[in-house]
Amino acid sequence: MKSIGVVRKVDELGRIVMPIELRRALDIAIKDSIEFFVDGDKIILKKYKPHGVCLMTGEITSENKEYGNGKITLSPEGAQLLLEEIQAALKE
């Protein structure tokens, strides 16, 4: 684990502010959900990504399929978009 040298106080409602530079680096936008994990005395925050969401379109449908031993989920539309991008890249 890497320290980024930032310390924040917890306010009276139990909130902390995540620095904008950190949010940008981790692609965390306003209204994004954050997952909390506990590992011993550590609290780990992770951007929440629901299971089954298409990597290309963000869609969650019953038609989504997993590829690469479950590492990539694509909707039919997302699979088509990815295929077109790969084909275009191979032509270059």
UniProtKB/Swiss-Prot annotation:
It comes from the Bacteria. InterPro entries: AbrB_C, B_subtilis_Trans_State_Reg, SpoVT-AbrB_dom, SpoVT-AbrB_sf. Gene3D superfamilies: 2.10.260.10. Pfam families: AbrB_C, MazE_antitoxin. Keywords: DNA-binding, Transcription, Transcription regulation. Signal peptide: none annotated. GO terms for molecular function: DNA binding. Residues 5-50 form the SpoVT-AbrB domain. To B.subtilis AbrB and SpoVT. This is Putative transition state regulator Abh.
